[in-house]
Amino acid sequence: MTLEETTDQYRNRAYQWLSENLTLLEEELNEDDGGVAVYLNVDLETERRLLNETVVWHQKKLAAGFAAIDWPLEYGGQGLPSSYTQIFQEEEAKFVTPDVHEAFIVTTGMVAPTIRDFGSELLREKALKGILDGSDTCVQLLSEPDAGSDLASV
């Protein structure tokens, strides 16, 4: 994005890029169309294929400047306001995209922002580049006493 680019121009550029790389949805989904599973129960081969498809799509967006949109420049982002991320997501929702693997959602949606916002500079330097380029995937372990996943007592 250039400094002169308005949100409408950004939206148009995003839509143009998406239309060159994806197929437009034939109809919009309604909330009544059923749920969307976050955690899939698939075999290892399918799991690897799905994660690879997610990473490839993410890398394509990253190369075009449509990933880490609201991340600071010093961490590999575009340095734009979060409203630009929202704009891109709204436009992307109009297209058929690869399914996003849950490990990638945890990595980019939970772990990366936590490291970016609260991690030491050393941790940021070590972790964020691999997360951003899709070469590193993270997991999040939770400890919930009396809820079946009390890792603290193990």
Task: Cite the ranges covered by each PLM segment.
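Conserved beta/loop motifs at nucleotide-recognition and modification sites
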Residues: 24
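Extended, charge-enriched "interface" segments that sit outside catalytic cores
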Residues: 13, 28, 48
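Glycine-rich flavin
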Residues: 31-154
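Intrinsic disorder at enzyme termini
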Residues: 1-11
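Mature N-terminal segment immediately following signal peptide/propeptide cleavage
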Residues: 16
